[in-house]
Amino acid sequence: MIFQRTVKEMVKTTGVGLHSGNKVTLSIKPAPVNTGIVLVRTDLEPAVAIPAKADLVRETTMCTALVNDEGVRISTIEHLFAALAGLGIDNAVIEVDAPEIPIMDGSASPWVFLLQSVGIQEQASAKKYLRIKNTVRVEDGDKWAELKPFKGFRVDFAIDFNHPEIARSQQHMVMDFSTSAFVRDISRARTFGFMRDIEYLRANNLALGGSMENAVVLDEYRVLNPDGLRYEDEFVKHKILDAFGDLYVAGYAIVGEFCAFKTGHALNNQLVRALLAQQDAWELVSFEKDEAPVSFSVPTGAAVFT
């Protein structure tokens, strides 16, 4: 049987909020089976818990944000959620003392390192997968995203940016998901932005924590970061990373193929909502280890405790 996973013990880190520019402290704690991922705002009195559910994603401008019915929000969850999804962690309580998750280096890599360093604990209950039975598709102009049946988890993603540096890079990628492939090929891809947009955002008290330490920054012609790119195709890989995080608010690892063209946080969330609403399009399943359609084998050097 493939079992559910949580973190072996609590782990804590600090970073900077992308939009506020303020210091943020975050803790990831073990959680019982079938808890899912729950975020807690510890800076409020009393603390407010917000479960990671698709219908609580109520803000998708420049990031993915969970907002409860009282208006309490936790923003910029997507990179941390990509790491949780990539490592197959089903259950965790995430405590944060601010309205946003720290941006770290703009990728999922610091979260992967943090989670692997503390260890991953298998739990005494079967892991549930969301298997796609029928194709579900959403569109917005020329942008679209769909989930369709597939024996594993495959991503087929294309972007289309009219920028000389991005146009020179590979803007289309197909990958069959495994934890090893995610850690190696996707997790280090950083968010990217354009200098013209950053100047506008800062004038409006946004992206105050953004810098070349946590983003790939481009002017009209080139990448401005002195060290350049981490991958030749870092732009499309970061969009895939975002999608991994956005899809994880479905609550389960997906067995199916995710295909997308020019999609972002808003359309990713629309797809998850459309999928969950169409109950004949999916089913929850569990697997024996030798039947696993998706590999969550953690790379060498990281510990999984049984």
Curated annotation (Swiss-Prot):
GO BP terms in the entry: lipid A biosynthetic process
A GO term, aspect molecular function: metal ion binding
Catalytic class of the enzyme: hydrolase
Pfam families linked: LpxC
Record bears the keyword Endoplasmic reticulum: no
Coiled coil: none
Domain of life according to the entry: Bacteria
GO CC annotation terms, alphabetical: membrane
Reaction equation(s) it catalyzes: a UDP-3-O-[(3R)-3-hydroxyacyl]-N-acetyl-alpha-D-glucosamine + H2O = a UDP-3-O-[(3R)-3-hydroxyacyl]-alpha-D-glucosamine + acetate
Cofactor: Zn(2+)
Keyword Acetylation belongs to the record: no
Alphabetically ordered keywords of this record: Hydrolase, Lipid A biosynthesis, Lipid biosynthesis, Lipid metabolism, Metal-binding, Zinc
InterPro entries for this protein: Ribosomal_Su5_D2-typ_SF, UDP-acyl_GlcNac_deAcase, UDP-acyl_GlcNac_deAcase_C, UDP-acyl_N-AcGlcN_deAcase_N
Pathway: Glycolipid biosynthesis; lipid IV(A) biosynthesis; lipid IV(A) from (3R)-3-hydroxytetradecanoyl-[acyl-carrier-protein] and UDP-N-acetyl-alpha-D-glucosamine: step 2/6
Binding of Zn(2+), residues: 79, 238, 242
Annotated SUPFAM superfamilies: Ribosomal protein S5 domain 2-like (SSF54211)
Record-annotated active site: 265
Function: Catalyzes the hydrolysis of UDP-3-O-myristoyl-N-acetylglucosamine to form UDP-3-O-myristoylglucosamine and acetate, the committed step in lipid A biosynthesis.
Stated family: Belongs to the LpxC family.
PANTHER family in UniProt: UDP-3-O-ACYL-N-ACETYLGLUCOSAMINE DEACETYLASE 1, MITOCHONDRIAL-RELATED
Protein name as catalogued: UDP-3-O-acyl-N-acetylglucosamine deacetylase
